[in-house]
From Swiss-Prot:
Gene3D superfamilies: Transcription elongation factor, GreA/GreB, C-terminal domain, Transcription elongation factor, GreA/GreB, N-terminal domain. This is Transcription elongation factor GreA. The keyword Transmembrane helix does not apply. Necessary for efficient RNA polymerase transcription elongation past template-encoded arresting sites. The arresting sites in DNA have the property of trapping a certain fraction of elongating RNA polymerases that pass through, resulting in locked ternary complexes. Cleavage of the nascent transcript by cleavage factors such as GreA or GreB allows the resumption of elongation from the new 3'terminus. GreA releases sequences of 2 to 3 nucleotides. The keyword Chloroplast does not apply. Keywords: DNA-binding, Transcription, Transcription regulation. HAMAP family: GreA_GreB. PANTHER family: TRANSCRIPTION ELONGATION FACTOR GREA. Pfam families: GreA_GreB (PF01272), GreA_GreB_N (PF03449).
Length: 159
């Protein structure tokens, strides 16, 4: 049985855009570069040829990777699922660090979509695991490498 990878609608759209670009722009450009490099003669010492072949290998590998992810993904539209006012996959959560009054806003996404610098956290991260299923005004304790941290849930958005 295949384990489906949870992915937001935005995450799937981003992968589809990348796949389209790789297939319609990058792949033809690389093929043209290989053909041009072949015209220069001896392929053994042709750096342009080897560089283009390496780029082709990377491009084709990424195409296969994206196609596999999309075929094994469960695309979840957070706006269309019941949440009962609780934190769920795909929701955007504003939390307050009770100790230092620092506020954070995170969106809970799939592993491949996560980007901490953009406040996109993986469903499998300690913060997300601690928040899932909780409601506004709940206090959660998140185990971090620096010790346990208490957060209060201020706001939950489903966008």
């Amino acid at each position: 049985m295949i384990n489906l990878i949870p992915m937001t609608v935005r995450g799937a759209e981003k992968l589809r855009r990348e796949l389209k670009k790789l297939k319609s722009i990058n792949r033809p450009r690389i093929i043209a570069a290989i053909a041009e490099a072949r015209e220069h003669g001896d392929l053994k010492e042709n750096a342009e040829y080897h560089s283009a072949r390496e780029e082709q290998s990377f491009c084709e590998g990424r195409i296969k990777e994206i196609e596999l992810k999309l075929s094994n993904s469960q695309i979840i539209d957070v706006t269309k699922i019941s949440n009962n006012g609780r934190v769920i996959f795909g929701s955007t959560v504003s939390i307050l660090n009770i100790k230092n009054n620092e506020k954070f806003t995170y969106r809970i996404v799939g592993d491949d979509e996560s980007d901490f610098k953009k406040n996109l956290i993986s469903i499998n991260s300690p913060i997300a695991r601690g928040l899932i299923g909780k409601e506004i005004n709940d206090v959660v304790i998140i185990c971090t490498p620096g010790g346990d941290v208490e957060y209060k849930i201020l706001k939950i958005n489903y966008i």
